[in-house]
Amino acid sequence: MMQPDHDLPYDLEGEILSHLPIQILARFRCVCKRWNTLFKERRFFNSDLGLARPQFILLAESKICSVDVNLDGPSIEVHNLPSDIPGYKLYMPMHVEYCDGLFLYATCYGIGICNPWLRQIRWFKSSYEGYDFSGMGYDNSRQDKHYKILGSYCTNTTMNASVTELGSDAWKSYEFAFHSWNLSMSPYSVSLNGNLYWVAYNHESRDYFIQSFDFSTVSFKHYCILPTKNGHRQCDGRSLAIFREDRFSFLEQEIYNTRNIEIWVTKETIKNGDGEAVEWVNLMSVLVPEWSSLSVNYYPPSYFVDEDKVGLTLVICCYNKEGKAYIYIAKGDKFHEIEIKDLVEYNPRHRTYFPNLIQVPTFTMSGRSITQHQVESRFAPLRGIQVSVGVGGDEWDDGFFDNVKEIIIHTNSLGIIFVKFYYRNGNVRVAGAAHGDSTETRGLMVPDDDYIEAVQGTYTESHITSMAFRLHKGNRSLRFGFFEGMSFVLGGARGSKIIGFYGRSSDLYLTAFGVHFSPLP
């Protein structure tokens, strides 16, 4: 006789789910209303936050992507993220901050808040002008979190700051005496327990220290001295990060001689208030091999320290001497470096990110809901359509640009085996990565006064057999490949403009193909 089903106690159910990998939990949100509600509770995602290995978020002009590092191998996986930023144009200044599992994007058109893991972005307009976007935190004296944004700029004698609640357009301005320090050594903040922290430099004492900002008291404060070995050398690489969720870690990299890396961590949990009693301990030292392309840059490296039963592993994301994005992994006497080939641009920005299930907060403004033209919610990847046929191979995405400039393709007796595209951003010609393996190619140039409107072709169950590119002015290219299988057409309505490509390539064929497009401006 079958026994009746009994629900597990709510707390026990939550405890079991919190020990599952976050990759699975993200898919479980749609199983039932009960679990979806559970995942939104702060007690749940606070307990789950430390279970996921950190990732890196990279921001280039053409796209935003996340990099997941597999330490067994090692290897990396690159995933494209929503990057439809309202009003964004090429080379427009954009500041990026990270707080409490959420990313902040700030441009002159407004401010966005994003959870890359849940693929959620919300935007609101703001009259945010004249200040550097300095970070997001909250008043930790209140029980509920109300996120606030800090903007600031320095003069010779004062630090001018402006604070607003997330979603509001009312900024309150403050002025602080300037005591021979600045935040120029730290292009981004570190948020912990609602407060903001930066690596700062005192020009009089020539010391590096942590500068803090407390949203509950609206005040800047000298928090604690940093354990630098070469305090007088401003050109060394220095980076502040979170360790074990409640402590600081500090990376220092020598620019001369050995380029050695030292990692320091705070001995105890970081608490709000006075930090003069903070103690630092040296966690690990890394000897960078002479053959490594790792270099010291003005933009500090993003990193995290992984702990397991075997030992400590330092994982760094930064760009190398040539400006190419790399992942560097140091464990014991082994040192690895992996190029992030999905990014074709140089010197991308990067941040460490802890995957989580924290929901992007909704906004209110002056007691009313923000209207549709003030905020947008985006839960989907980049605009694009695709034909996906065969299996196997490596997924790739060139991103999106102003226009497509040149197409390089190679075929054999069965179909398309190689593609490579050149793009244009402003007056800059950008080379996409090569997809496939070939030495013999055919090309198509796109005139400066024209653009690709659609891609037509054929495919079988295993691969793309042919492609032709339709230009807006009515000229169709020669067909590449062999007309065999089912037909496809990729593109938007008449007048839409293709601005990038993505797909999947195996050692033998092009097995999937897609386009990014936008309406004609």
From Swiss-Prot:
This is Jacalin-related lectin 38. SMART domains: FBOX, Jacalin. The keyword Oxidoreductase does not apply. It comes from Arabidopsis thaliana. Belongs to the jacalin lectin family. SUPFAM superfamilies: F-box domain, Mannose-binding lectins. The lineage of its organism: Eukaryota, Viridiplantae, Streptophyta, Embryophyta, Tracheophyta. Pfam families: F-box, FBA_1, Jacalin. Residues 2-48 form the F-box domain. It comes from the Eukaryota. Residues 377-519 form the Jacalin-type lectin domain.
